[in-house]
Amino acid sequence: MIPTALWRKLGGFDSRYFMYGEEADLCLRAAAMGYLPMITPDAQIMHLGGASAPKGVRMLQNWTSKATLVRGHWPRLLAPVGLSELWLSCATRALAAAMLGKLSGRSNANNDWRMMWEKPSRWHKT
């Protein structure tokens, strides 16, 4: 929950984030203005209706938001470190998924991570 006045002062959600990271960005911007965002662990949200994108699309949106958060909120000199960590994490997961796919005999087991690894420009945008 956020007071309307603060919501307006912050300009609402940043349109660069779609489905992932918008709350983190909003809280980081509020903190930069001296506010103290808090987590309310008992809060619940009920979506009335709705849809879900395929897993690969969700992964791409999530990782794009992570990279956008790093570029937008990390200190300029540290942002390349954060982006490198994301790249390394993606590489590790793609390798692990490929190995598990080979061991299990499921050749399509790593399709989503393979896509993320083969096309980092889609989310990393260096």
Language model feature labels by segment:
Residues 1-44:
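A short, conserved alpha-helix in the catalytic core of glycosyltransferases
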Residues 18, 32-35, 43-65:
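Nucleotide-sugar-dependent glycosyltransferase catalytic core
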Residues 34, 73-77:
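A general structural signal marking secondary-structure boundaries and capping sites
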